[in-house]
């Protein structure tokens, strides 16, 4: 079992989907505290209740957070340190989707500036801001509380694909994976491991946003199955994230692990 007991974790985008599944698994395995940053206050309230049912001993610290704001992210991480005194691991899951299959070839001509900026601000800038703040906190904490520390950034199967659509999404996720690999080399001497997880087609509330023309969840999943992709659960991805956050995954760093469907 992955060793995360009695440790403090930060999770962006933790209120639903893969982020929530990660929080639930960390609580089951004895995490001391889960510090969740997400835009949805309502989802965080529901998540906090479910975590308390799983493990009443796990402390839950929820913050309404816009990861595209460096100042908000910096304050969030500083608050974690001031409240709990340490940060052992972080999973940066927050991201936004981009709908596919709605544009005429060449789809590039319909990739507008505002959409590009919005996707990058969350999917790549947000990764930079969160990772940077977490490394700063871990570096400072490790001098007084040495031990294995880990950051997991969530990209996507799109980071490995070359799709003639959703340019902003795919490029931002490829950037996330590349960035994390570079950070991994930079911080490993400090005892901080950084890795990427790239989920395949995952059954989450965000999945229908990738296929906006579909009328039902079943239609969304059938679209992907026809293209040769299997559909996995958020819990499947969470198990890999928690393994990377745990000491059981030492000395793994600088990887981009595909979970679920790979490119056919």
Swiss-Prot record:
Keyword Signal recorded: yes
Biological pathway: Alkaloid biosynthesis; ergot alkaloid biosynthesis
UniProt: NADP(+) binding residues: 18, 66, 132, 169, 173, 204
Stretch forming the signal peptide: 1-20
EC class of the enzyme, as a word: oxidoreductase
Keywords, sorted A to Z: Alkaloid metabolism, NADP, Oxidoreductase, Signal
Enzyme Commission identifier(s): 1.1.1.332
Biological processes per GO annotation: indole alkaloid biosynthetic process
MF (Gene Ontology): oxidoreductase activity
Residues forming the catalytic site: 169 (proton donor), 173 (lowers pka of active site tyr)
Reaction catalysis annotation: chanoclavine-I + NAD(+) = chanoclavine-I aldehyde + NADH + H(+)
Protein purpose: Chanoclavine-I dehydrogenase; part of the gene cluster that mediates the biosynthesis of fungal ergot alkaloid. DmaW catalyzes the first step of ergot alkaloid biosynthesis by condensing dimethylallyl diphosphate (DMAP) and tryptophan to form 4-dimethylallyl-L-tryptophan. The second step is catalyzed by the methyltransferase easF that methylates 4-dimethylallyl-L-tryptophan in the presence of S-adenosyl-L-methionine, resulting in the formation of 4-dimethylallyl-L-abrine.
Quaternary context: Homotetramer.
Protein's name according to its UniProt entry: Chanoclavine-I dehydrogenase easD
Taxonomy of the source species: Eukaryota, Fungi, Dikarya, Ascomycota, Pezizomycotina
């Amino acid at each position: 079992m992955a060793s995360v007991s009695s440790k403090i974790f930060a999770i962006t985008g933790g209120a639903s989907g893969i982020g929530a599944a990660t929080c639930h698994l960390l609580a089951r395995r004895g995490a001391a505290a889960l510090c969740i940053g997400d835009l949805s206050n309502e989802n965080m309230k529901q998540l906090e209740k479910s975590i308390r049912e799983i493990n009443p001993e796990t402390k839950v610290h929820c913050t309404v957070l816009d990861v595209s704001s460096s100042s908000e992210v910096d304050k969030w991480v500083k608050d974690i340190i001031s409240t709990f005194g340490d940060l052992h691991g972080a999973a940066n899951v927050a991201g936004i989707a981009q709908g596919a299959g709605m544009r005429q070839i060449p789809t590039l001509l319909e990739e507008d500036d505002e959409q590009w900026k919005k996707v990058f601000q969350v999917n790549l800038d947000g990764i930079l801001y969160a990772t940077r703040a977490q490394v700063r906190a871990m570096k400072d904490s490790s001098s007084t509380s040495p031990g294995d520390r880990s950051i997991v950034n969530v990209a996507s199967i799109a980071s490995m694909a070359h799709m003639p659509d959703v340019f902003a999404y795919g490029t931002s996720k490829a950037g996330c994976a590349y960035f994390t690999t570079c950070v991994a080399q930079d911080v490993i001497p400090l005892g901080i491991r950084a890795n990427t997880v790239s989920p395949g087609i995952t059954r989450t509330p965000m999945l229908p946003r990738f296929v906006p023309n579909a009328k039902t969840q079943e239609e969304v999943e059938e679209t992907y199955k026809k293209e040769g992709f299997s559909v996995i659960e958020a819990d499947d991805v969470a198990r890999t994230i928690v393994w990377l956050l745990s000491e059981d995954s030492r000395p793994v760093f600088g990887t981009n692990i595909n979970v679920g469907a790979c490119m056919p």
